[in-house]
Amino acid sequence: MHPSTASAPVPARAAVVIVGGGVLGASIAFHLAEAGVAGVLLLERDRPAAGSSGKPIGGVRAQFSDPLNIRIGRRSLEAWRAFGERPGADIGLASVGYLFLLGDATERGLFAAGVAAQNALGVPSRLIGPAEAAALCPYLDPDRILAAAYCPTDGYALPGAAVTGYLRAAVRRGAAVRTHCPVTAIETSGGTVRAVRTPHGTVRTGAVICCAGAWSAEVGAMAGVRLPVTPVRRQIAFTGPLHPAPPRIPFTLDFATTAYFHNDGADGLLLGMSDPRQKPGFGREFSREWLEPFRAAVARRAPALAAVPVSHGWAGLYETTPDNNALIGESADAGRFLYATGFSGHGFLQAPAVGELVRDLYLGREPFLDVGPLAATRFEGRAGKGGTAGGGPRGDRPEAHII
């Protein structure tokens, strides 16, 4: 059961209001409460993990092209492995590794550079040949790939369990959670956050942290802050029990098409793919039209799975940004409006480290890395509060290893 209190009134005051009850908001609530911050209030418009964090299984990895993402991913992996002790919950972590399938020299070169950057930061990834890739994942046809990138410490876990674990630990440390409590307005005065309005009352507060996922642009606008986040539907499907049961395999994905698959329990597979035809929007109904391009894509690498049966599926939202990198920082335009959103599919895996980062931004501590390059204003060529812009011509920094 989620540690929610839908029927309780909102408090009249809070030191900090977190908007969004997904894994990012839950992690931040835990890290703030653990640090001794009194008056932490998390508001969720629906129920915890109702948005992007509701995905049944979420990948965790440190294989990225951007050094910032590598560092955040590695630190988060350490926290996921220790989650049973801190904050104390079973998240079903399966450290089966990630296996990126590469079909040509250009892809191999891109991942060779990524592996070099990852190794320099302590991530044990490596490039492997087709035979070794097929040994790790027997569904693969080694004649249909050129190489693969593999990291044995990557894997997947259960987002819902992580959200519940974080929130329960936060509540034990004094945080408050209100569900079915959407934020309808944010009051500012003198360039600083003053209050948050909800259908259940107004909360006077000196700080707001936006973790509203696909709805973050709307929340930011309430405070006069531009958060360039666009919602896009993503879908996954499940085979149900297979006979014979699948072997234990890595989280395996074809880089060119984003088609991926991995174990789902003991006897089935989870299937997924980013459909390039999908238009932005908030629709979350599951449909099967994407399975046709998925089957065509998987036939290129693992022909044995091209006709695998599908029993059911799930649809959720990616919160995307123009460069597929997160928005993390504090607004220079609305004092004490912080944000952690726009993760473009890697929010779950980065949640532990992001909780640390936002905690330190809120407390004025030196974070373990400079998040200035992830400021929402990078697309305008401006740095976030207390950081540097960096990146591309506008300050953007495209992430290549996106699913």
Segments predicted by a language model, with ranges:
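Helical element adjacent to the flavin cofactor pocket in flavoenzyme catalytic cores
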Residues: A149-G206
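A short, basic/flexible loop-to-alpha-helix module at the beginning of a structural domain
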Residues: M1-R13
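Glycine-rich FAD pyrophosphate-binding loop
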Residues: A33-G54
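Short beta-strand to alpha-helix junction loop
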Residues: R71-R74, L102-G109, Y150-R168, E285-E292
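Beta1/beta-strand and adjacent pyrophosphate-binding region of the FAD-binding site
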Residues: V10-L24, L41
